[in-house]
Amino acid sequence: MLESVRIEPKMSYRKIVGVNGPLVIMDNIRFLKYAEMVSLTLPDGSVRQGQVLEVSGKKAVIQVFEGTAGIDVKETQVTFTGETMKMGMSEDVLGRIFNGSGRVIDGGPKIIPEDYLDIQGQPLNPYARIYPEEMIQTGISSIDVMNSIARGQKIPIFSASGLPHNEIAAQICRQAGLVKRKDSIDSSDDNFAIVFAAMGVNVETANFFRNSFEASGSIGRTALFLNLANDPTIERIITPRLALTAAEYLAYEREKHVLVIMTDMSSYADALREVSAAREEVPGRRGYPGYMYTDLSTIYERAGRLEGRNGSITQIPILTMPNDDITHPIPDLTGYITEGQIYVDRQMHNRQIYPPINVLPSLSRLMKSAIGEGMTRKDHGDVSNQLYAKYAIGKDAQAMKAVVGEDSLSAEDRISIEFLERFEREFISQRHDELRTVDQSLDIAWDLLKVFPREMLNRIPSDILDEFHSVAPVGVE
């Protein structure tokens, strides 16, 4: 029996035949395995980590996560480990800060792992997935009421350069929690965790997130993975996978409800393009590789819920659209994979509205399963539909006003414009530290809808109007 077992030793070589960007090319290598981890020892004694990206006979193409600067072709020793990249996991990752390669950078002790998990994730049986239900409350009215996020959903934030997507992400991390339900047995804060992955951010942004979480006290339930702008570009390819591996451990082994926020996915896609260019692959749109859709799906599809496990993974990736172009390959392909989007608008930002979320191009495809009686409130869906309708009509009336002038507007158009201005000022706009419950947000919405006569609220059933239309709003803290 033992004769059939072949133990392959760790092999070390000094056979680098070339370095191209973040890639190292080697030849005459035995026992090669695709995606196995590689350790590179430089002449000065420093050690870097890499991964086999391509195997062709005895040739290997290796991507080096810490970059290839300083690698001596003749003197660098390369050791093939025979193992895929794994990360040591423990519940102690919460409250800790890691760099983009998964090393602790907060000055604390190393994590004592309870398990080692492959960063590519475990293959999930599609039949075992549970449809996302039950809402995660972000405390932001425009998201909670009009683009509600379900546990296990993946919904990106489409932003652009210079817009406050970092502030929105930090606010969601600070305020996010499970909607309290009478029949829920796991709605305590102990069962809610946040995994935050930053790719290609500058030091100022990294310190902003770090200080924000520490000041609010939410750092204790948050694991941060920070890849800085001056860190190797190639490292950005593994940062989101490390973060999602931590999320999968917390969700499926520790049965926590995990919110994963990743910023900026545009930096990730640019790193993917850099590796593709170094491999001299045929480029696709805008120079991005043709397999970018498939690659992005290996990240986004790791959200969800599994039958027999109480935990869930909800993803909110953030990406900056180059030149505010929503047809750019990154937001375009992301929109195909994910279940909606939250759109951050530059014009609203210029009008000093925070958060500048434009609800009209925003969408949550799984919203209906997360709201309603027993989950949020029975008027939630109808109020959301009515807000959308009246806001869209108000936008049309505002455009008409710019053409014909205010004096030529009908009484209905003037009411619509009044609603639009109050809606943006009172409902969408809120403070950076303002946490609104779903009930508070819905009460504000009812207060705004009262500017219309009852017969103009044609998206809300009469029984809902009878119950809520005359109720005084609850004050917002």
Swiss-Prot record:
Q: Which residues are listed for ATP binding in this entry?
A: R365
What's a GO cellular component annotated to this UniProt protein?
vacuolar proton-transporting V-type ATPase, V1 domain
Q: Which InterPro entries match?
A: ATP-synt_VA_C (IPR055190), ATPase_a/bsu_AS (IPR020003), ATPase_F1/V1/A1_a/bsu_N (IPR004100), ATPase_F1/V1/A1_a/bsu_nucl-bd (IPR000194), ATPase_V1-cplx_bsu (IPR005723), P-loop_NTPase (IPR027417), V-ATPase_su_B/beta (IPR022879)
Cysteine pairs forming cystine bridges in this chain are none
Q: For this UniProt entry, what is the primary localization, expressed as one broad class?
A: membrane
Q: Is Ribosomal protein there in the keyword field?
A: no
GO terms assigned for molecular function: ATP binding; proton-transporting ATPase activity, rotational mechanism
Gene3D superfamilies given in the database record: 3.40.50.12240
**Where found in the cell?**
Vacuole membrane
Among Pfam families, the record links this protein to:
ATP-synt_ab, ATP-synt_ab_N, ATP-synt_VA_C
Arranged from A to Z, the UniProt key words for this protein are:
ATP-binding, Hydrogen ion transport, Ion transport, Membrane, Nucleotide-binding, Transport, Vacuole
Record GO biological process: ATP metabolic process; vacuolar acidification
| Membrane topology (UniProt) | Peripheral membrane protein
Assembly, in brief, is: V-ATPase is a heteromultimeric enzyme composed of a peripheral catalytic V1 complex (components A to H) attached to an integral membrane V0 proton pore complex (components: a, c, c', c'', d, e, f and VOA1).
What is stated as this protein's family in its record? Answer: Belongs to the ATPase alpha/beta chains family.
Function description = Non-catalytic subunit of the V1 complex of vacuolar(H+)-ATPase (V-ATPase), a multisubunit enzyme composed of a peripheral complex (V1) that hydrolyzes ATP and a membrane integral complex (V0) that translocates protons. V-ATPase is responsible for acidifying and maintaining the pH of intracellular compartments.
Under the heading PANTHER family, the entry gives: V-TYPE PROTON ATPASE SUBUNIT B
Q: What is this protein called?
A: V-type proton ATPase subunit B
The primary gene name is VMA2
